[in-house]
Amino acid sequence: MASIPPDDDAAAAAAAGAAENGYGNGKGNGNGPAPRPPPAKRPRSVISAAQIRAEFEHHEAGVARVNNGSFGCCPSSLLDAQARWQRLFIAQPDDFYFHALQPGLRRSRAAVAGLVNAGDVAEVSLVDNATTAAAIVLQHAAWSFAEGRFSRGDAVLMLHYAYGAVKKSIHAYVARAGATVVEVPLPFPVASADAIIAEFRAALDVAKAGGRKVRLAVIDHITSMPSVVIPVKELVAICREEGVDKVFIDAAHSIGQVPVDVRDIGADFYTSNLHKWFFCPPAVAFLHTRKDDPIASQLHHPVVSHEYGNGLPMESGWIGTRDYSAQLVVPESIDFVNRFEGGIEGIRSRNHEKVIEMGKMLAEAWGTFLGTPPELCGSMVMVGLPGCLGVESDDDVMRMRTMLRKDFMVEVPIYYNSRRVEAQEMAKDKNGDAVTGYVRISHQVYNVTEDYEKLRDAVNKLVADGFTSSKLRPSQKQETMA
């Protein structure tokens, strides 16, 4: 019979304990009190620099990879754990489905529940990514409009810097169903958390104008582009004070970048990817709902399977034949982070300190500045590019990003700051040129100072050579031929 493939006896014992507690027994519903995460391995010493390099030796050599934010990273030990699950399925898929899959998923859900201080393992569902979690929440909102629980014109609030796929999902699901979508126009560069809170309050007043009900607020914990840590606990409290029905926190980047306590934050729905900053292989995320919320039982995975109606954790745990291995190795990711001094909090703290240090180094070299104060950064920071590079569009930044990748072997996202908040002047560099382009640099355990020096030198060379973004734009003739 197939069984959970543990790395060691501790993991096996954790799985056995899960079964005894009622969430490791066959294909049961997985409800019960949240247990502690599976015990981590206890190596004799913390992981060494050489061991870290070995864990990520599959990264392409010579590339300055300062973009952990987009796709995350996965160490070799986690890839090995994933492969064990994949082989278990391939060896005997029927036995795997009936006896190993659901206990393994409950083991991962239990690990997440302990990680984020969920009240019950039943509050945690595993999904592919935060975009899927958003679809689950927004689908319910759309049904509420369609079935008359919400009135046409009721509002949904979101940040202007919400992730692009989530913004499109809001329009595809709830705007189409009859919602009025109101955006919070956040300034950038950002001066303080107070500035974000003020803009949020003002936008909420707009959303409530004329007695309109605000049915849902979608708030990022860390915005993607530009990257800013949002004061979510304060914004959730404001939503409660102002009578917003539900609050959904899109925290795609949060686990591993900032502390997460879902009960302390107090939102109705909270999602975060585990493959971005928590070392899981892609793709796996969790969606947390509150067990005392009647809406939780009305949420459904957008892919309808045989588990429809058995609760979101079960629906998400089987959406048809596919590779579930990324969702099954969450306990092993906890083992991995516990090899570092201070565990995930130690990693997070060191990444934050280093990315701020590297961001300041780049800003000084380029005569620019950081896009946010350090307290509004996690393990990512926005750094202004010299204004003389002449970034004037999203197309410009994509072409420049491609050039940095191909010509300099630097992988970094670039942001075009096109918006000007009323009464806010466009920030300028040391030469008085408007700063319209920003790089978003990340720091993860595999990064070294030389990665950022490579980026620094590439941009300095472009400036010294008199490069401007216009040189990468297609000619009028090329555009006509296309």
Swiss-Prot record:
Coiled coil: none annotated. Keywords: Lyase, Pyridoxal phosphate. It holds the Pfam family Aminotran_5. Its EC number is 4.4.1.28. It catalyses: L-cysteine + H2O = hydrogen sulfide + pyruvate + NH4(+) + H(+). Its cofactor is pyridoxal 5'-phosphate. GO terms for molecular function: L-cysteine desulfhydrase activity. Residues 11-22 have a biased composition (Low complexity). Residues 1-45 are annotated as: Disordered. It comes from the Eukaryota. Residues 1-10 have a biased composition (Acidic residues). The modification N6-(pyridoxal phosphate)lysine is found at residue 276. Catalyzes the production of hydrogen sulfide (H2S) from cysteine. Belongs to the class-V pyridoxal-phosphate-dependent aminotransferase family. This is Putative L-cysteine desulfhydrase 1. It comes from Oryza sativa subsp. japonica. The lineage of its organism: Eukaryota, Viridiplantae, Streptophyta, Embryophyta, Tracheophyta.
